[in-house]
Amino acid sequence: ARGPQLRLRF
């Protein structure tokens, strides 16, 4: 998903 998790698996 495109949210606060997009930095976890760049």
UniProtKB/Swiss-Prot annotation:
Single annotated GO MF: hormone activity
Transmembrane segments: none
Stretches of the chain forming a coiled coil according to its record: none
Keyword annotations from UniProtKB, A to Z: Amidation, Hormone, Neuropeptide, Secreted
GO cellular component terms, A-Z: extracellular region
GO process annotations (BP): neuropeptide signaling pathway
Subcellular location: Secreted
Residue numbers carrying Phenylalanine amide: F10
Signal sequence range: none
Major subcellular location class: secreted
Record's function text: Neuropeptide. Stimulates egg development in L.migratoria, but not in N.bullata. May be involved in the regulation of adult diapause.
Family indicated by similarity: Belongs to the NPY family.
Protein's name according to its UniProt entry: Neuropeptide NPF-1
Organism encoding this protein: Leptinotarsa decemlineata (Colorado potato beetle)
